[in-house]
Amino acid sequence: MKTKLIPIIALAASLCLPAAVSAAEKAIPGQQSMVILEGNFQFIPGSWADYTILDKAKNETYRMLMSVLEQENYKGLPCRWLEIEVAMKDQSTVVTRILATETKNGPGDLQKAVVQVEGYSPFSVPRKFLQGKDQEVGKVEPARVVKRLERKTLSRLGKTIQAWVVEAQTAQGKNVSAVVSEELPPFCIYQAETEDTRLTVNDWGLGALTRIKGEPTSFFLWIIEQIGRELNKK
């Protein structure tokens, strides 16, 4: 089932007529927030990790593939291209490519973003949706490790890593239980759990390449293209 275009068309209206669409509407498809443990993210080029995430409230799971790609200096800032691929049941896979500043705690401010819904051409995300109260792309929830509990040796898919069981907390006071390892870039998270979600690694490695296919168009041209495609089906 193709990702519905109604929320995206609604976004176009909201940009032109802000009162037309409520702030609660989701506009950019396939976006999920991520918990990142401060000081554990590694910007290793080509590194990738594949996770299964359980949404406890909905009792639904989805898969997320995170990868670190090439570096780029943007307006004098050291930045890195990252990609997040989200695959949800009965929905089109969505790849989000973001250019974020590199900080010691992980990805910082977003500078650019490109989104591609499976079966469609990619589009550039307007800056409006990269920062501030309207941010929809690349949301991260930093958590600070407050206690290291025990050291563990873990094996998965023939790979053996050394890890720590830790307790962490977000700025909003959300508690995070996690198993972390420096041998598992880029997230360095083997498993993490909050009251809302549980994240478990499936596999990880090196050699990641971009999954965006084709040159991105502007968001408004992309909207027009999709409307034309829908009209041609009728």
Language-model features: locations:
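Positively charged n-region of N-terminal signal peptides that target proteins for export
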Residues: 1-5
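Bacterial N-terminal signal peptides
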Residues: 7-18
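Acidic, serine/threonine-rich low-complexity disordered tracts
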Residues: 24-234
